[in-house]
A protein has these predicted regions:
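Short acidic active-site motifs
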Residues: 82-83, 106-108, 127
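Structural alpha-helical scaffold elements that stabilize or flank donor/cofactor-binding regions
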Residues: 111-112, 131
Length: 168
């Protein structure tokens, strides 16, 4: 049995991280990506950004996405709660986030049969307080070295691998 996974990318700063996450998302069969806050996103129909800026951002994302920016459905929201509400309406019933937190559980111990929305956050500050308060679970990747954090795109790829292998 497999579950469907969508991603929520909130307040991620780097176009390279967004592109890399999109590429990993495509590899692991992510169904939809929800962009919120100031996360850069690919070109959209009726884009309200300045045309030269939207094209520049799209080009930077495309460098690391390698085509995934055109293969995964996505939508853009100003606010996290609106993105989560849209995901719920689309059938994603379990809202989880990836973060180091005293309340977190190891990602390899997490198990669900529900389609889920995985939130990842800002490169420096992680996911928002709102996300931590509203997530059904806070998941953490075990680390054993001296560094206490992973790049958001690397962490997302590891999380997607773990979550897609819950039900191989």
């Amino acid at each position: 049995m497999s579950i469907n996974i969508s991603l929520l990318l909130h307040d991620i700063r780097s176009t390279q991280n967004v592109g890399s996450i999109m590429r990993s998302a495509d590899c692991f069969g992510v169904k939809h990506i929800y962009f919120s806050g100031y996360t850069p996103y690919p070109l959209i129909q009726n884009d309200t950004r300045l045309p030269h800026l939207a094209k520049k951002i799209n080009s930077r994302i495309a460098k690391t996405a390698l085509g995934a920016e055109t293969s995964i459905p996505f939508s853009v929201y100003n606010y996290e709660p609106d993105a989560v509400s849209a995901a719920n309406k689309a059938g994603f019933k379990q809202f989880v986030c990836l973060e180091q937190d005293p309340a977190s559980i190891p990602i390899n111990k997490y198990n669900t049969n529900l389609d889920l929305l995985l939130a990842v956050g800002n490169e420096l500050n992680g996911v928002s307080f709102w996300t931590r308060q509203n997530a059904h679970a806070i998941l953490e990747i075990a680390q054993f070295g001296k560094k206490e954090s992973l790049n958001v795109s690397n962490a997302t790829a590891i999380a997607l691998y773990a979550l897609t292998n819950m039900h191989p």
